[in-house]
Each structure stands twice: as C-alpha cells, then as structure tokens.
Amino acid sequence: MDLSKLNPPQREAVITTEGPLLVLAGAGSGKTRVITHRIVHILNERPGGALARNILAVTFTNKAATEMKERLVKMAGPRAQGVLVCTFHAFGAEMLREDIHRLGWPRKFAIADMGDQLALIRRAMRDHKVDDRAFDARKVLTLISKAKNSGLEPQLSPEGMGDDYDLITHLVYPNYQLALKAQGSVDFDDLLLLPARLLREHEDLNEKYTRRFRYLLVDEFQDTNMAQMNLLRLLAGKVRNVCAVGDDDQAIYSWRGAEVRNILEFDSHFPGSREVRLEQNYRSMQVVLDAANAVIAKNPERKAKRMWTDRLGGERIKVVTCPNEEEEARFVAHEIQKQMALGISADDIAVLYRTNGQSRPVEEMLREKGIAYEVVGGSEFFDRREVKDVIAYFKVIANPRDEVSLLRIVNVPARGIGDVTMERLHAHARADGVSLWAAMGRSQGYEDLPAGAAEKVGEFLQLIERYRGLFEEGKLAQVTRQLLEEIGFREATRALAPSLTAADKKLKSVDHVLNSLESFEKREGPKASLLTYLNRLSLDTRQEEEEVPGGHRRVTLMTVHASKGLEYRLVFFIGMEEELMPHKGMQGEPQNLEEERRLCYVGITRAKELLYLSRAAIRVKRGKEVPCTPSRFLEDLPPEAVEKVDLAAPRTGAPTDQERNFFANLKDRFKPKGAGGGAGPTPADRKV
C-alpha cells in the first residue's frame, strides 16, 4: 500500500502496529484516513499476515461504522469484510447473545425500552416506599445510567450524601437490576457493563476474546466513558495492541458520561504507550487555526499541541457586536445573502449556537429573506409542539374557522372536551352545512351532547371571543402572557414534559415566542396585529413546493455539539456572550468551564475559510432587556486575526464599510413586492 501521500506523523501512526498507541488527531487532521490505512497496513504487512477477523475497530455511531467498512472494502477488497467495525454497544450485544446465560439471564434476552425501564424504576421506588409522584422516575433512571456508564455495579453504587435523588438511586438501582433480570431484559447501558463482567468472571471467555482480537482500534476516544474503558482494557489482554484515536480538545460530551481523563491518562491505563500527534490541518485557513489555538491554549488540562496548515492568508475573523438578538439575526441573514451572491453555496454555510432556543430569530430572518435552511439536531423552532400550540391559539383567535388549529387546541391544556364530543360536533357541522366553530356555538341545542360537555364547549368559545377583543386592543405579548396564565399553559407543559430538563426547554421555547412578539411590536409600532404577525410566520404553500434556487441546497442551523465532525466554507457562531458561551450552567466547576472552552474550539474549527463570531449587546429575558457581557473567549483571540465590527456603538463618525454595506441593504426589507431585488422564494424548510 502506498503511504507516500501521508505526512510523517500520519505514516508513523499507520506503521506503529504493536503495543499501545495514542494518536492525538487534531481537528481536520485526517484521522479517518489514518485509521483505514492502519487497518489495511496490518492486513498487508504483518508477518504471516493478520486475519481480518483479528481486527476490531470501534466507532461511536452506526453510520460511522458503515462508512468505515465501505472504505476498507474499497481499499483492501473483499478480505476486509472480515474486519469487525461496530459501536461499543453493538459489540457488547453480540457478546451477550452468545454468553449472557452465564450471568443468569436467559439466552434470548430483550433490550428494555424507555417505557419498560421507567415502569421498573417506579415499581422499585414503591418497593422502598418512595412516592413516584414526588420524585421524578426519569431523573432516577438518568442517575442509574450515569452509575453504569461509570462502570459501577448495583452493589458498588455510591450512597447518597445529602441529596434525596442520590439516596433514592442507591436504594432503587439493585431492585431495578433484579427486575430487569427477572423479566429477561437488559438496558442499553448493560450492553457495556455485562460484557465486562463476563470477561472478568470467566477466564475462558477472556482468553477467547483476547486471542481473537489481536488489534483494537477506537475512534473518537475522547468520548469514551469508564464502562467502555473497562471493557477495552479487558479485551486488550496481555498483548495490548490498542490504538486509540481522538482529540482531548474536542471532548464535549461529559453530560453523556464521557470521561476526558481516559485520553489524558491513556498511559496510566496502558503503561509504556507511544504517542503520535497529528497537528497538520487540511480543513481551515491558518487565521482560523490561530484563533482556535489561542482559545484552547488557556485550558490547563490538555495534551499540548498546535494546529497548523499550508493554507495561509485568508480573511480575518469578523467579531461582530449587534444591538440585540434580532439585529444579530438580521446581520447573519444579510451576510449569508451577500456571500451566496458571491458564489458560496447555501449548503456550505452553517449557523452555530450553544442552545437550540437561539435558532428562533435566525429562522425568522432567513424566512423573511427567502433563504432555504434546515435545522439539524432538533426540531425547527416553529415545529416544536409547545410553539405550535401557542401559534394555533393565535390562529383560532384571528380566524375561528381555522379547523386544523381549532382541533389542535380545543383541549390543550385539557379542559374536558374530548374526542367524542368533537366528533359529534363535527358531524353536526357537516349536517348543518356550517363551520365547526359555528356548530360549537350551537352545542347547547344538540341532544346527543351531554350538558357538561356543552358547558365546557361554551366556556372555551367565551375564552376565545374575549381574547379576540383583547388582542385587537394591541399589546400582543402582554395579552399572550395573560392568556397563557389563565389557561394554565405553563403548568400543563411542565406536567407533560418527560423530564425537568425537557420542561425547562419547552418553557424557554414559549418565552422565545413572547420575545418574538415583543420584537415584532417594537418594529411594527401601531401597525402590529396578530394577523400580520401570523402572516409573517406563515409560508405560502405554493412557494414551499417550488424548487429552491440551486436545487435543494440549504443553510444549516445547529448547535455546536451537533456540528462536531462537520466543516463549512462559511460559519456564523452566534451568541458569543457570557451565560451562553460559556453557558451559565457550566461556569461553576473548573472542569465545566474547560469543556465550554473545548466547545468553543470545536465551533471555531468548523470553518474552512470565513468565520463570524457575533454577539448581542442586549437580549430580552423574561420580557426585560438585559445587557450582555462579551464572552471571555473573545478576549483570547489574537488581535492580528480579528476584525471587529460594532453595530451597537453610538454613531460618532462615518460608518465603516462593513456597517455601511449592512445598513444599505436593509432597505431591501421594505421594498414592496414586485419592486425588484426582493428576497426571492420562501424556503421549503425541513427537519433533519
């Protein structure tokens, strides 16, 4: 196999096949090429020729495993089919299918789904006289999962120290595990925990697996948890031909149980290991890498490395300060429009943010400008259930004959108007030739409708009519708050959410709707009305069905977490403020702040050529304008790599070219249709 196209560190990583090896693969350094070349090299060059079945390559997603296997077959031919490429969990499941009976489970076991797990957790809580209405079973399950990912068996789980949930978890975990076993089930985390127990407790199995897998490769090693590390050490046996490929600077999944110390302390787990550093970047311009290097260098707990590239020059990074989040979104949309006109394809542009809730203003501005986009790693803001419910209330208040919206919210929150009642009213509407709303107004006269149901329908009609009058008086956001309070929308949303975290996210989405209304009212002034707001949000069906210019290319919107492993010519990293980046929930412990810095590094290194880091000077939080402090990470950027653009500063002189171009283009927003230079077709948005 020709290794001449590999750089020296890459070649060293490929040909170092014996003994433990840590490959520190920086962002864009070609790690996938190194892994595939290394496997093929082992197949070709080892004395006597290694068999494909002696190689185990572990990835973190099934998609990555499939893609790697395809590359191997393309490079080495059919013999590469014998290489086992899979996730840790898939490997564990295969082990258990053969030998789980040795642990007392039936040979044909089931993997419990979330519903099964929660039912068993609640039963175990009741066994210990724990009120499953007072304590969230999902949180207990999360803590048990965390214990399993740390490699802790039930008898080893730490006892709670003053925290009720820790104590409950300590009590419930053993009962939960026994209940799983009694019904012949395992959970997802057991796919790591139980195989390790098999290898520890059964010497013949240990010998079987260590004899078969002579070469182990683990991709994305920085994302491993302790349960995976324990399994890997057992599989490595005495031969210890372990190649771990990863980047501690991209360790951003501690909330999933990933343990960055696995990569930082690799040599303590595998003494005498060698280390190869891949520092040449094939993705980004040097100016982008200079910024990334400067940010990540401030982390004390890391493997020292400095990314470099042959791609010198390039435009400086734009650090943009905007008056507020709406103007930040408008700036992003304008710059996207400008760069697309200069030839950058929409699918080579990404907007990154720390939390999903930040997408709303950007989505609105992209819709307004007719720029097609897709939201990755979560539903689009206006597709979220709680948001659609609020918007449906607006639609019914603005137009009671909107039957789809009416059916959506007539019993949301629950008010005793069930499906049977609505089916009967629908039948009467068809028979009388009137709208469903009109039929609801006649509910007292329908004999097949119980008096109680008719009364509930009447109360709902009165609610809608009353709020129609209130909305016509203006103050849209204020009236919406009053409506949501009266119907108990927040309480119902919180009660129906699967977890406390999910409830918080849903309520934040509701707050974003209110912020959107307030921004709309400020912008439109006396012209603001519920109907004009809805018209702005709505997409014309005909335009949705039209082909977006350039085929189906779309700008990508996603969290920084979701962007890992991806790359774009143009990247906008928005919300570069304290409490967002770094996130307010991660600023307490030093290790949390270090992870936020790594997250910032990941976001920066997604950019190949152009990078914008933007922030808002003011954000609306719970109906109030709050000043925002610039992210501390902006202070770490090298001055020579940065061009600052301040759109929020008071005007004291002539505007910069950047500002002049930005504000000059705002007039496009106010052009009447048909005046030329419009925004183009409305996007056909979709969820990925």
Residues of each region from the PLM?
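Acidic, low-complexity intrinsically disordered tails
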Residues: 1, 640-688
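P-loop NTPase Walker
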Residues: 1-112, 183, 206-207, 261, ...
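Helicase P-loop NTPase motor core
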Residues: 29-35, 100, 271-274, 279-372, ...
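Conserved phosphoryl-transfer catalytic core
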Residues: 59, 75-76, 82, 235-257, ...
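Conserved helicase C-terminal RecA-like lobe
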Residues: 162, 345, 359-371, 384, ...
